Amino acid sequence: MTEHTHDHGRGVLSQLAPEGRELKALIPGVYEGFAQLHTAAFAEGVLDKKTKELLALAIAIAVRCDGCIASHARGAAVNKATEAEVAETIGVAIAMSGGPGTVYGPRALAAFRDFAP
């Protein structure tokens, strides 16, 4: 495994947590609404939770959101995605986002490895 100087998994989520709690206290209704949307969108359905987390990970890479990458890398790991599945997901994200995907894709892989058993 390659050494890297930036946190991409747990470190990102830990860094964002205090600010997130602070903002949630200021606009609780928005956060409650988002939580309901998230629960509905990620509920088991025709697509299983693992597939939904992999989709979200690809989108997170494409929109260059480090917090989203960390969150959905964790979700992919929790839902038992394999490293090979994550790598293919990253490949699709690179195809859809171009050069930035080659920057954020490795971050996503590092984040997944941080959460994977």
Residue ranges of predicted features:
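Acidic, glycine/proline-rich low-complexity segments that act as flexible tails and inter-domain linkers
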Residues: 1-51, 104-117
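Intrinsically disordered, low-complexity cationic segments
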Residues: 3-7, 71, 89
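Amphipathic alpha-helical segments within well-ordered protein domains
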Residues: 38-39, 56, 73-77, 91
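Immediate flanking context of iron-sulfur cluster ligation sites
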Residues: 46-63, 84-91
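Short cysteine clusters
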Residues: 65-68
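Iron-sulfur (Fe-S) cluster-binding segments and ferredoxin-like electron-carrier domains
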Residues: 71-83, 112
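C-terminal structural segments of small proteins and small subunits
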Residues: 87-112
